[in-house]
Amino acid sequence: MERSWYWRVALVVAVAILSIYQLVPSWFYFKLPPDQRNTEAYDTSVPGWAPDAKHHLNLGLDLQGGILLSMGVDVDRAVKTKVARRADEIGEFLKGKNVAFTGTKVVGGGAQVEVSAANPGEVKDAVLGSTGYSEEMYSPGGAPDGAVRFAFKDSVLRDFREKAVKQAEKVIRNRVDKWGVTEPDIKTKANNQIQVQLPGFKDPEKAKELLGRTAQLEFKIADDENPVLDQVRTQLPQCQGDRQGLSLPLPESGCWTVEPVELPSGGSRAATMVAANTRTELEKVITEKLNPLLDPQKNVVGIGEGQVGQGPIKTTYYRTYLLRAKTELTGDYIADAAVAIDQSDTLQRGRPVVSFKMSPEGARLMDKLTSENMRRRMATVLDDKVETAPYIQGRISSNGQITLGSGRNQQDMFDEANGIALVLKAGALPAPVTITEERTVGATLGPELVRKGTLAALVGLALVVVFMVVYYRGTGLVADVALALNGLLVLAVMSMIGTTLTLPGIAGFVLTLGMAVDANVLINERIREEMRAGRNVRQSVQLGYDRVFWTIVDSHVTTLVAGVVLFQYGSGPIRGFAVTLIIGLVASMFTSIVVTRVIMEYFTRHDTARLSV
């Protein structure tokens, strides 16, 4: 035998062994009952020497069921956020141009920016004289004396809305990918809707928590010197309590109390804060009592949690923080986030925290922010909740951490920290999303139909195997061996790349098996023709493969092009069919041209060999 034959044998054996190895997780996955396949029971059942447990064959929504969520993106909120950032940018732009102004604010329902200045004309000329701003906005007039307004063009607002939906879809896709759900179907629908299908996932509450969470991380400076909230003492009752904390439950109307806060200039003061039993109660107090006292361009009220109690048994209440309105820094600058254990010498020591790392630009901005606000409290606000508000004791640049509320067991805190780290890494949604539809979907086909379909496929495959042996005898048996390896190889590749097997995917799989059989039929018929022409067995096999090679390649490549087009322009089930088809075609060429030839050359290695064909 030639040396090249031994190399080809080694290749075939290696491919077969690797395919079996790759399918080990799938073997353990399908051995378990359906309700245990996506749990720790599966993770612990896979041997340590096997591939990663996540590399197993997955069944699609039509075969195993799952969760379907439809989410609406609040594009108007996204526009307001974008306009508010533009207002801050215009302020920085005017400072850079040394143009005098007294302030910027968002007006006109969140779609216009108003700049107050002694000379509004100078502000208008500076802003609209800049190419970047003149392409986006114009001055509609209607501003009060001593101010000028800038409105965004309709095309720009439309672009803001479209980008908000696209960014939301991208963020949701990133979260699902980091979550480990394989082959989700995520697509944008009409009316700013995004539909998400999660095959095999059975926990709708966890899905809503991770996908629906906005994950807007903001850093704001506390305005502890401002006594404006002291006025609420005449409108609300005082909270009752002692040195151990507040006496719960609190009045339904909310109540006020004081907390000592350090001042940047030295010393301290008793700052007023408002507390309530629930977030809903506190939000009502803020809307009715506190917001009328504030200038919304200067201050906002943040909501955080407090705990009362000793040891592991604690009761949560909700409290206010008076913050500056301006968001100094956002989570857009976070490069990475992970769960860690607090090592500080505080009550948080040993508890899970979310550590994060800023991007280079974020590190520069954080360093500037902390250096300018020494001895002030900096609130970390995640989705409108103040997670922590420590004092800035030194300059912070690239690394930071978010502490979590106490009063819960360690596992709950780990789960929350994992969820926060995941959404921070995947990015924040550009605007809040609301769940408009939620369904736990059962398998479309049902267990009985799946069983019957599987039985039909196996019976059909068995008939093909028997036919090949009866009609082609020895060479038919070789073709059957190649067919088995073909199926093994296709399933192994699908499990390795995380492809989900759907009903259309099964159709693609069966089609490629049929093409593999067809290729072997062409080879066997060609070998017969060469033997009828008087050539010996060895020559017939060699010429048979050589002369049918391009016919097989041509048919497979033509179908492969069609599969690529379907994958590129199709979606959902069509892409599933295309992926399986492409993998199967490549495997079919390998088994038909390489595997069967290696076996045939072994049995016909002598000129006097006989062949049953």
Curated annotation (Swiss-Prot):
The keyword Ribonucleoprotein does not apply. It is a multi-pass membrane protein. Its main location: membrane. One of its GO terms (molecular function) is protein-transporting ATPase activity. The chain crosses the membrane at residues 10-30, 452-472, 477-497, 503-523, 548-568, 576-596. Gene3D superfamilies: 3.30.1360.200, 3.30.70.3220, Multidrug efflux transporter AcrB transmembrane domain (1.20.1640.10). Keywords: Cell inner membrane, Cell membrane, Membrane, Protein transport, Translocation, Transmembrane, Transmembrane helix, Transport. InterPro entries: Acrflvin-R (IPR001036), SecD (IPR005791), SecD/SecF_arch_bac (IPR022813), SecD_1st (IPR048631), SecD_SecF_C (IPR048634), SecD_SecF_C_bact (IPR055344), SecDF_P1_head (IPR054384). It is found in: Cell inner membrane. GO terms for biological process: intracellular protein transmembrane transport; protein targeting; protein transport by the Sec complex. It holds the Pfam family SecD_1st. One of its GO terms (cellular component) is plasma membrane. Forms a complex with SecF. Part of the essential Sec protein translocation apparatus which comprises SecA, SecYEG and auxiliary proteins SecDF-YajC and YidC. Part of the Sec protein translocase complex. Interacts with the SecYEG preprotein conducting channel. SecDF uses the proton motive force (PMF) to complete protein translocation after the ATP-dependent function of SecA. Belongs to the SecD/SecF family. SecD subfamily. This is Protein translocase subunit SecD. It comes from Anaeromyxobacter dehalogenans (strain 2CP-C). The gene is secD.
